[in-house]
Amino acid sequence: MSRLHAHKRYHGQSGSKRPLRTTKPEWAPYDKEFVENKIIELAKQGYSPAMIGLILRDQYGIPDVRLYIGKSLQDFLEEKGLLPDIPWDLIYLLKRAYRVYKHIELNPRDTQAKRNYQLIISKIHRLAKYYKRKGVLPKDWKYSIEIARLYAVQ
């Protein structure tokens, strides 16, 4: 969704591909229990699933959590009840919207920031519509700057 409002939407998307490994690497010193405990510990500290994956990859050399625990990180956290009530991608958009809103309050003539704020709000509405349809968000959930402020302060 990051390229949704960009002019060159389909260019510059090259990058590394995930390895096609289906088994745990032989050189990995960690077992399933260690990885599960580390995930739970990091989730209780408030890290998002994306950050947990980065920490496990960079600090512990765990290339793919799924190879160790047999399920995705998101599914594991959902099973343990450690996910927030609003999905992480929506939380990040809410924080971003509040940050831009505060900037516009301080700089009311910044028209480019106003336009960016409108684009962020559009993404929030589109994502909220999807999550309402999937049953992740309640049907009466609506975006407001107060909701964004609550998540930005956390």
Curated annotation (Swiss-Prot):
GO MF term list: small ribosomal subunit rRNA binding; structural constituent of ribosome
Gene Ontology CC, one term: cytosolic small ribosomal subunit
Region (Disordered) residue spans: 1-24
Entries under InterPro entries matching the protein: Ribosomal_uS15 (IPR000589), Ribosomal_uS15_arc_euk (IPR023029), Ribosomal_uS15_N (IPR012606), uS15_NS1_RNA-bd_sf (IPR009068)
Biased segments, Basic residues type: 1-11
Highest rank taxon of the organism: Archaea
UniProt xrefs under SUPFAM superfamilies: S15/NS1 RNA-binding domain (SSF47060)
Keywords: Ribonucleoprotein, Ribosomal protein
GO biological process, alphabetically ordered: translation
Cross-referenced NCBIfam families: PRK08561.1 (NF006331)
Family: Belongs to the universal ribosomal protein uS15 family.
HAMAP family: Ribosomal_uS15_A (MF_01343_A)
Self-association state and partner proteins as the record states: Part of the 30S ribosomal subunit.
Stated name of the protein: Small ribosomal subunit protein uS15
The species this protein was found in: Nanoarchaeum equitans (strain Kin4-M)
Gene: rps15
